[in-house]
Protein backbone atom coordinates (compact mmCIF):
# COMPACT_ATOMS: atom_id res chain seq x y z
CA UNK A 1 0.00 0.00 0.00
CA UNK A 2 1.20 3.50 -0.85
CA UNK A 3 0.32 5.92 1.95
CA UNK A 4 -0.11 9.62 1.22
CA UNK A 5 -0.41 12.16 4.05
CA UNK A 6 -1.24 15.80 3.45
CA UNK A 7 -0.69 18.81 5.68
CA UNK A 8 -3.50 20.96 4.31
CA UNK A 9 -3.87 24.73 4.21
CA UNK A 10 -6.09 27.20 2.42
CA UNK A 11 -3.60 28.01 -0.37
CA UNK A 12 -1.42 24.92 -0.65
CA UNK A 13 -0.80 21.45 0.75
CA UNK A 14 2.42 19.72 1.71
CA UNK A 15 2.18 16.08 0.68
CA UNK A 16 4.30 13.17 1.96
CA UNK A 17 4.14 10.05 -0.22
CA UNK A 18 5.30 6.78 1.32
CA UNK A 19 5.88 4.23 -1.43
CA UNK A 20 6.22 0.59 -0.31
CA UNK A 21 9.82 -0.50 0.20
CA UNK A 22 11.11 3.07 0.50
CA UNK A 23 12.12 4.48 3.86
CA UNK A 24 12.30 8.11 2.79
CA UNK A 25 9.02 9.74 1.72
CA UNK A 26 8.67 11.87 -1.38
CA UNK A 27 7.63 15.41 -0.41
CA UNK A 28 5.50 17.55 -2.71
CA UNK A 29 3.94 20.98 -2.42
CA UNK A 30 0.63 21.27 -4.25
CA UNK A 31 -1.52 24.36 -4.80
CA UNK A 32 -5.05 23.98 -3.45
CA UNK A 33 -6.69 24.11 -6.87
CA UNK A 34 -8.83 21.58 -8.70
CA UNK A 35 -6.24 21.22 -11.47
CA UNK A 36 -3.25 20.74 -9.15
CA UNK A 37 -5.05 18.29 -6.85
CA UNK A 38 -6.18 16.23 -9.87
CA UNK A 39 -2.65 16.25 -11.32
CA UNK A 40 -1.12 15.15 -7.99
CA UNK A 41 -3.64 12.34 -7.40
CA UNK A 42 -3.34 10.99 -10.94
CA UNK A 43 0.46 11.12 -10.81
CA UNK A 44 0.61 9.21 -7.52
CA UNK A 45 -1.97 6.64 -8.68
CA UNK A 46 0.06 6.08 -11.86
CA UNK A 47 3.43 5.71 -10.08
CA UNK A 48 2.26 3.66 -7.10
CA UNK A 49 2.41 -0.13 -7.21
CA UNK A 50 -1.00 -1.28 -6.03
CA UNK A 51 -3.40 0.39 -3.61
CA UNK A 52 -3.05 4.07 -2.64
CA UNK A 53 -4.60 5.59 0.48
CA UNK A 54 -4.62 9.34 1.17
CA UNK A 55 -5.22 11.11 4.48
CA UNK A 56 -5.34 14.60 5.94
CA UNK A 57 -6.43 16.15 9.23
CA UNK A 58 -9.94 17.58 9.38
CA UNK A 59 -9.78 21.36 9.25
CA UNK A 60 -9.92 24.22 6.78
CA UNK A 61 -10.58 22.00 3.75
CA UNK A 62 -13.65 20.33 5.19
CA UNK A 63 -14.63 17.18 3.33
CA UNK A 64 -14.48 18.69 -0.17
CA UNK A 65 -10.85 17.62 -0.57
CA UNK A 66 -11.76 14.02 0.34
CA UNK A 67 -14.59 13.99 -2.20
CA UNK A 68 -12.32 15.49 -4.84
CA UNK A 69 -9.56 12.90 -4.29
CA UNK A 70 -12.08 10.07 -4.37
CA UNK A 71 -13.64 11.43 -7.57
CA UNK A 72 -10.18 11.06 -9.18
CA UNK A 73 -9.96 7.40 -8.15
CA UNK A 74 -8.08 7.63 -4.85
CA UNK A 75 -9.27 6.49 -1.43
CA UNK A 76 -9.05 9.21 1.23
CA UNK A 77 -9.47 9.26 5.01
CA UNK A 78 -10.10 12.42 7.01
CA UNK A 79 -8.33 12.19 10.36
CA UNK A 80 -9.54 13.59 13.70
CA UNK A 81 -6.84 16.14 14.69
CA UNK A 82 -7.70 15.85 18.37
CA UNK A 83 -6.82 12.14 18.28
CA UNK A 84 -3.42 12.45 16.56
CA UNK A 85 -0.75 11.25 19.03
CA UNK A 86 1.66 14.01 20.10
CA UNK A 87 5.16 13.44 21.48
CA UNK A 88 6.24 15.52 24.45
CA UNK A 89 8.66 18.24 23.48
CA UNK A 90 7.60 18.45 19.82
CA UNK A 91 7.48 22.21 19.47
CA UNK A 92 9.08 22.95 16.10
CA UNK A 93 6.33 22.59 13.53
CA UNK A 94 6.73 22.96 9.81
CA UNK A 95 4.41 21.81 7.05
CA UNK A 96 7.02 19.29 5.89
CA UNK A 97 7.49 17.83 9.39
CA UNK A 98 3.74 17.70 9.96
CA UNK A 99 3.20 15.82 6.69
CA UNK A 100 5.99 13.33 7.48
CA UNK A 101 4.69 12.83 11.03
CA UNK A 102 1.17 12.25 9.72
CA UNK A 103 2.54 9.78 7.15
CA UNK A 104 4.47 7.85 9.82
CA UNK A 105 1.41 7.59 12.07
CA UNK A 106 -0.82 6.71 9.09
CA UNK A 107 1.50 3.88 8.00
CA UNK A 108 1.54 2.57 11.58
CA UNK A 109 -2.26 2.58 11.78
CA UNK A 110 -2.31 5.03 14.71
CA UNK A 111 -4.78 7.55 13.27
CA UNK A 112 -8.54 7.74 13.81
CA UNK A 113 -10.73 8.46 10.81
CA UNK A 114 -13.78 10.69 11.16
CA UNK A 115 -17.00 9.79 9.39
CA UNK A 116 -17.57 12.17 6.52
CA UNK A 117 -21.09 13.57 6.27
CA UNK A 118 -22.79 13.48 2.90
CA UNK A 119 -22.89 16.83 1.05
CA UNK A 120 -26.45 17.60 2.23
CA UNK A 121 -25.57 16.94 5.87
CA UNK A 122 -22.47 19.11 5.52
CA UNK A 123 -24.52 21.93 3.94
CA UNK A 124 -27.11 21.68 6.74
CA UNK A 125 -24.34 21.77 9.35
CA UNK A 126 -22.72 24.81 7.70
CA UNK A 127 -26.05 26.65 7.57
CA UNK A 128 -26.76 25.88 11.23
CA UNK A 129 -23.30 27.12 12.26
CA UNK A 130 -23.66 30.30 10.20
CA UNK A 131 -27.05 31.02 11.73
CA UNK A 132 -25.69 30.47 15.25
CA UNK A 133 -22.75 32.76 14.50
CA UNK A 134 -25.08 35.47 13.15
CA UNK A 135 -27.27 35.23 16.29
CA UNK A 136 -24.21 35.59 18.53
CA UNK A 137 -22.96 38.58 16.51
CA UNK A 138 -26.39 40.24 16.73
CA UNK A 139 -26.51 39.71 20.51
CA UNK A 140 -22.98 41.10 20.96
CA UNK A 141 -23.74 44.23 18.90
CA UNK A 142 -27.00 44.81 20.78
CA UNK A 143 -25.11 44.68 24.09
CA UNK A 144 -22.50 47.09 22.73
CA UNK A 145 -25.22 49.55 21.70
CA UNK A 146 -26.90 49.38 25.12
CA UNK A 147 -23.53 49.89 26.88
CA UNK A 148 -22.71 52.87 24.64
CA UNK A 149 -26.08 54.48 25.35
CA UNK A 150 -25.64 53.82 29.09
CA UNK A 151 -22.19 55.46 29.12
CA UNK A 152 -23.79 58.57 27.62
CA UNK A 153 -26.59 58.63 30.18
CA UNK A 154 -29.36 57.11 28.07
CA UNK A 155 -31.10 54.27 29.90
CA UNK A 156 -34.39 52.84 28.65
CA UNK A 157 -36.84 52.11 31.48
CA UNK A 158 -40.21 51.72 29.73
CA UNK A 159 -40.15 47.95 29.15
CA UNK A 160 -38.09 45.36 27.33
CA UNK A 161 -35.18 46.23 25.09
CA UNK A 162 -35.34 45.79 21.31
CA UNK A 163 -39.11 46.05 21.05
CA UNK A 164 -40.67 48.45 18.53
CA UNK A 165 -41.15 50.92 21.37
CA UNK A 166 -37.51 50.66 22.44
CA UNK A 167 -36.23 51.12 18.88
CA UNK A 168 -38.48 54.18 18.46
CA UNK A 169 -37.03 55.57 21.72
CA UNK A 170 -33.49 55.10 20.33
CA UNK A 171 -34.43 56.86 17.08
CA UNK A 172 -35.71 59.83 19.09
CA UNK A 173 -32.37 60.39 20.86
Give, region by region, the residue ranges found by the protein language model.
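Gly/Thr-rich phosphate-binding beta-strand-loop-beta motif of the actin/hexokinase/Hsp70
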Residues: 1-19, 102
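Short, glycine/acidic-enriched loop or turn micro-motifs at the edges of active sites
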Residues: 10, 60, 83
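Short, well-ordered alpha-helical microsegments
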Residues: 14, 62-66
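Glycine-rich phosphate-binding "P-loop"
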Residues: 20-35
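Short, basic/hydrophobic alpha-helical segments
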Residues: 34-53
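Acidic beta-strand-to-loop metal/phosphate-binding motif
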Residues: 50-59, 102
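Short alpha-helix plus adjacent loop in nuclease-associated cores
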Residues: 70, 76-129, 133, 166-173
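Glycine-rich, often acidic, oxyanion-interacting loops/wings at catalytic, nucleic-acid
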Residues: 128-173
Amino acid sequence: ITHVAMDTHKKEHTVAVGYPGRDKPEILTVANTVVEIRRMVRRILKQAPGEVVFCYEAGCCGFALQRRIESYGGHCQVIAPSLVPVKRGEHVKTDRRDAIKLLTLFRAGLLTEVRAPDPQQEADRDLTRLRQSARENLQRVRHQILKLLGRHGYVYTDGDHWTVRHRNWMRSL
